[in-house]
Amino acid sequence: MEEVRTERKGGSPVPSRILASNEVRARSFGSSGEFMQARELHVRLAKVSKAYDSHVVLADIDLEVRPGEFVVIVGRSGSGKSTLLNLIAGLDFPSSGEIRLLGQSLTELTEEQRAKLRCHSLGFVFQFFNLIPTLTVAENIRLPMALNGIAKNEAKSRTNTLLHDLAMAECGQRFPEELSGGEQQRIAIARAMAHRPAVVLADEPTGNLDLETARDVLELLDQTCRGQGTTLIMATHSREVIGLADRVLTIRDSHLQEAER
């Protein structure tokens, strides 16, 4: 499958540490702009198919995602985008084929091992924010760090940094219901990134937001992942994100293929 790459256009200012991290990330590319082949793939699907009874959702999917890439998967509703993300996360099993996440074959892991891999190495951003209403903003962000055994002082420091970068430094002690939809999604992004996962899976992250807010959230997610060198795989129907992505793929008739720009 031929890769199509574009440069991110426009967007809000990026914190200096994110720019610095992007410079480091850029040096991992070869002179042609392609990722160096020596780097281990973060995600690899080989001939993956998924069917429910007689209904084939995905057929013969081949996909390779390298560290730090931003890959967007588009397609009509019901085309299998969410199913593909669930397979990558090990939340569902393929009918055939192999899925490797961070070099590990998901089918060879126990459920406990898959759960640990998700907890330590994956971050999730969904259409619905799923913030815990009885916890403050700061407590919501710190939750995945607590689950990963990160020291309280370090967790507090990371939380303060994320809130500052989100321009929400004054919101740490507020509760989710006090925030707008766009603000809640920003907090959901911070929570997904707090434990510094290797891969973030985003499923329609702007589905409940107005166009302007959606654009801001997409740019924030892109900047934050690039700043941490995090691989981002996003399923969406939004055309706004195409200019931000390294690659855009589409699911059509159960097959994954290069999307038209």
Where are these regions (language model features)?
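H-loop (His-switch) and adjacent beta-strand-loop-beta switch element
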Residues: 248-260
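ABC-family P-loop ATPase nucleotide-binding domain
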Residues: 2-49, 257-261
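ABC family nucleotide-binding domain
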Residues: 41-43, 48-251
